[in-house]
């Protein structure tokens, strides 16, 4: 770990004015400290934001929720309003990491965690995400955990977050503050596909700080389900995950949300497939057709072709489980 300057600002204005291209904000540090220990991230300045007033969950006038960026993953998962109104989010958070990590990890930090690609974490090998232009050995190497959707010649890494898959399905919005003022980013636009710049995971500028996540009022809570498929029962990242939510009138689908994790550089959502579900009857055939449509452009690598079949089955199961989910207030 390299030497660094440490600051603890008293307010958001001071925090964003301390930031620069060589600084990093730190809260729980559950990913950043690992990256620093492995010499993957080498910030010259750490800005401790744990003293900022960003740790509340508040109701909005529109019937949604505003979640402060410093609310811990554990507190968010068990918050009564989240359990009641957004059970999909609670399920996703509790499927990730371990109790100890969830106690420390912040909501804002969860959005910023970096890929768990083996090659990204090995500073002795090339990696376009770590060193742009150096190459992507995962394309021809050990690529069992890598992307089957939205990848590029430059990068086949996947996004590791469970929480973000649910936030994508819930159409969250990300509130950020920079020197130039505040702005709101639609969750669908927050994370990037790798393209020719895989070193950029998201749309944040160097001086911008996530201050809150906003959830719109949700009418799909009753019929929702988060399914995570992984190599072991706990403390493992998803090979494939699915956040599914339905609004039903009888056995007819009125609205649908479907997001996948473990398959792309960002949570993967196909709005055209969601739209195709509307008006359809709840059935295995309906869900099978949706799964096929989501995966029609999947491009497997040498070792991860199994993910296509796995994702197909996971989509069908998650939608089926969402359709029969028990009554929720």
Regions found by a protein language model. Give the residues of each.
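C-terminal structural segment of proteins
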Residues: 1-329
């Amino acid at each position: 770990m390299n030497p660094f300057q440490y600051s603890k600002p008293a307010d958001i204005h001071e925090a964003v004015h301390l930031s620069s291209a060589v600084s990093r904000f730190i809260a729980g540090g559950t990913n950043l400290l690992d990256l620093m220990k492995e010499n993957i991230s080498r910030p010259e300045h750490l800005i401790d934001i744990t003293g900022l007033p960003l740790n509340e969950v508040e109701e909005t006038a529109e019937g949604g929720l505003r979640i402060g960026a410093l609310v811990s993953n554990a507190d968010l998962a068990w918050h009564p309003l989240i359990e009641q109104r957004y059970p999909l989010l609670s399920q996703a958070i509790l499927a990730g990491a371990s109790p100890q990590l969830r106690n420390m990890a912040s909501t804002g930090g969860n959005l910023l965690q970096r890929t768990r690609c083996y090659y990204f974490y090995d500073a002795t090998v090339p990696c376009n995400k770590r060193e742009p232009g150096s190459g992507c050995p995962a394309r021809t190497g050990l690529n069992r955990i890598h992307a089957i959707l939205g990848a590029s010649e430059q990068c086949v890494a996947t996004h590791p977050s469970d929480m973000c898959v649910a936030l994508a399905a819930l159409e969250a919005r990300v509130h950020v503050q920079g020197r130039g003022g505040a702005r709101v980013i639609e969750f669908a636009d927050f994370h990037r596909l790798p393209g020719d710049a895989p070193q950029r995971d998201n749309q944040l500028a160097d001086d911008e700080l996530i201050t809150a996540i906003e959830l719109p009022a949700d009418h799909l809570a009753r019929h929702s389900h988060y399914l995570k498929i992984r190599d072991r029962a706990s403390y493992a990242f998803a090979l494939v995950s699915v956040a599914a939510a339905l609004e039903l009138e009888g056995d007819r689908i009125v609205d649908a949300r479907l997001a996948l994790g473990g398959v792309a550089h960002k949570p993967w959502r196909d709005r055209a497939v969601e739209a195709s579900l509307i008006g359809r009857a709840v059935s295995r055939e309906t869900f099978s057709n949706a799964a096929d449509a989501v995966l029609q452009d999947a491009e497997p690598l040498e070792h991860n072709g199994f993910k296509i079949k796995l994702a197909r089955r996971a989509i069908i199961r998650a939608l089926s489980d969402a359709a029969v989910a028990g009554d929720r207030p």
